Amino acid sequence: MATKRHALIKRREAVGHTQETLAAAMDVDRTTVGRWESGRAIPRPWMRPKLARQLRVNADQLDKLLAPEPSAVPSAVPPPHPKPETSLRVSLVQAVATDSAESALFINFASATNVDTILLEQLDADVSRLALEYVSKPLPDLVHQIGALRSGVFELLRGRQRPHQTIRLYLTAGRLSGLATHVALDLGHYAVAATHARTAWLCAESADHDGMRAWVRSAQSLIAYWQRDYALAAHLASAGMPFADGGTIGARLLSLQARAAAALGDGPAALRAIEAAADARTGPGLNELPGIFSFPEAKQWTYAGTALLALNSSSYVGRAIAASTRAIALYEGAPSLDQSSGDLLAGHLDLANAYLARGDGDAAQESLTAVLTASPDRYTASIARRLNTLSNRLSSPVYSGSSLLSGLRENVREACSRPALTTTPEPSP
């Protein structure tokens, strides 16, 4: 039997709404509001934030307004002069009735949820779409979508769900925090990125998801790498390996180890990690999302090229050129949604540096065409740093005698001066 929600009615009246005006504000029929108040229906999860705003309450307060009100348990009236054994029986009946009412209330509590299967599936689909679009679309097109969806999931987690639904929400929140980490990384806001990464780790722990734990360690390794803490970058990548659960995450972590080891000047460790990464690739994992959460072969070759070039030895220049060339070819041959603009530009910059190391200015200039003609909104923090490093390199006396490289130097300087994503100041995390 439905129980009238008196608290909901009182709150609606307290804020000045009639059933008709509340229905109009909610874009529903008046009878729908009537069913909510009579206990014969309950607002769907996606309607609750709007209803909470209309009633000027938060999500938890709305849950209490919508909770069924317990029916009063009729108490037995004792006879004027009860016998001791009769009073005992009455007390026992009352105790049993009270226990029954408490069980009924707990059933209502335990079965209440602010999500359903359809909503969870939609969240999964939205995260997959954003993860895929992140690698190929300009960052300004996605940053607000990522933030809004993440805030919505956090708000859902402040409500009540069944345990398996809460686990799924934590995993979704972790993935969205991972996307937020990459947004901050691409802007060069490393302290903010570290905060988002810690949030992602907390969510991975709450969801007890090894794949997400491993991915977060890879993101934290990236942050350390671009902060030039190469020892920490290598350590974090190594710390993620025990959580690698198949798919491409093992190759990602080993490739990160290779780059960090090369930056530290540890050639043998870098070469071992490059080879191990090639062996670790097993294809997409069972629960591996696309885009930013996967590690395509092209990206692996990009990392290998960077690592080989960082060894700063003529012995590895040929291999670095081959790796970067392979990465570019794989990206350019991939579907447009899989073409990571950042990794493509990184590959071209590495290739140009490798050709300069070999003394081939013409090939270096050709390699840089894609970078110099790219839109400034594609210049992430890592690309901007690589460009500045190249500009400094071309300014050294060893390249001063070449008219070809003199023109290239001016083009690179001009590219470095363009307004880009990284011109925004870093906020406090």
Regions found by a protein language model. Name each.
Residues 105-109:
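Intrinsically disordered, low-complexity activation-like regions
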Residues 1-10, 24-31, 35, 42-99, ...:
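Short amphipathic recognition helices of helix-turn-helix/homeodomain-type DNA-binding modules
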Residues 9-12, 19:
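Short, cationic motifs built from Arg/Lys/His that form the positively charged side of catalytic pockets
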Residues 17, 28, 57, 189, ...:
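Short glycine/serine/threonine/alanine-rich loop segments
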Residues 20, 37:
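Acidic-residue sensor for enzyme active/binding pockets
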Residues 15, 69, 99-104, 394, ...:
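Short, flexible helical or helix-coil boundary motifs
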Residues 111-115, 120, 124-429:
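Conserved binding/catalytic microenvironments
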